[in-house]
Structure formats: C-alpha cells, structure tokens
Amino acid sequence: MSARTHIFDLDTLRLTAGEGRRLSLEVPVQGFSFGGQRYQPVPARATVTLEVSRMTHGGYALRLRLETALEGPCMRCLEPASPTISVDVREVDQPGGGEELTSPYMDGAVLDLAAWAHDALALALPAQIVCREECAGLCPLCGERLDDAGPEHRHERAPDPRWGKLRELKFE
C-alpha cells in the first residue's frame, strides 16, 4: 500500500551507512503551462518509487521513478492529447560536499518529494505534446485539421504582385 506524502523525513527510515530502502509513495503533482497551454497530470497524485541509500560519509543517494499521463491540447491540431511521461532521476545530498553534492530538494534530512517530482516531469517533457506522432496539424491558411482533410487539401496561392506587369504582356 502506498503512503500519502509530499514532504518526507528520511531520518524516519533510520538507515545506517550503506543501507538502503525502496518506497512506494503517492505524491501530488502540479500541472504545467507549456507552449501557452495548460497540461494536467492524470491522476493528480502520482505513485512514485523512491529509493533511498545512506552514504558512508553522511548524506543520501536518492532515485525517483514515476510514470504519469499529461492531459491537454495537442500542440499541432489542438485535439486532446494524453502522452505518458516516464521519469527516472537521481539526486545526491552530502552535507559539506559543495554545490554539486547538495540537492535543492533536501533541507537537512527532509526531502520535498512533490517539488522533485514536478521538476523531474518538467525536464522530461517532450519538445511538443502531440495527440500522436504522425499528427499533421492544422492548415495555416484555413485552419482545417490536415489529418481529416487528407493529402488532396490544397489552396491556390495568390500570384506575387511584383510579377503583375508580366501578366499584362501580350504575345502575338
């Protein structure tokens, strides 16, 4: 059974140096504004796997894994999209170890799991959220969805006005 938490005190695990634990936790995940659109994780509480290891010289090595769907509009055609995002990230927090060995999600032995999950999801987002990879998007001239219109969808282009005088030429 999953525990419900977003702030987790690692000292409650009572790990000794070199010891580790794997936990299944439910974490609230906030939505994203991406490309001017709003995307919501579904479900709003993601089940995450947290692996915690106590390091020999103090501090923790952490691994976070989660998978969730994001619901929102396709960036190409505006139809509903629901891609699944998988996350597998690691953090190290070693007191006195310098900036590279200090996790921004740790305050002493307290881990802000919700912030870490949110940031990890944000970094795992694809360049475009689409309803399907083959989505052709919308016609830039009329706005029709190109997947529905088919390959025969075309528009006559207006002739370039700079060439207008050539149309006035009469050949006999």
Residue ranges and their predicted role:
Residues M1-E172:
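Structured interface patches
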